[in-house]
Amino acid sequence: MDMYGPEPLGYLIPTAEGRLMVIETVRDRRPPQNDVDNAVLFMSMLAYSGRCRVLDDNRFVTDVDVAWHPAWMNTEQTRAFEIDDDLLSVSTVGMVHPNFPGRTGQAVVRWRRTSE
């Protein structure tokens, strides 16, 4: 399943202080007209931040202290990563996404370095 479409928008921002911030959305989000639209917007995004530590086997762990979904608050989110030039590939390690309770899955997200 392509949760956020073929060309999602987003940023993964590591800071010098050891914090990681991630936001990812569907590209064609529209302003909501009603409560149903608001719910669709919530389901079409992901955002979290926390202290991050890199492990020695190409994995990192984020201790989440703020998130778009309360289920991720105060959790550890572990990701595998691979760097190839300006491309960072990040994959989940078998997780349950809060928008899909009871279903375990894996995601791979590719981030390209920007000059901004």
Regions found by a protein language model. Give the residues of each.
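Lipid interaction determinants
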Residues: 1-47, 54-116
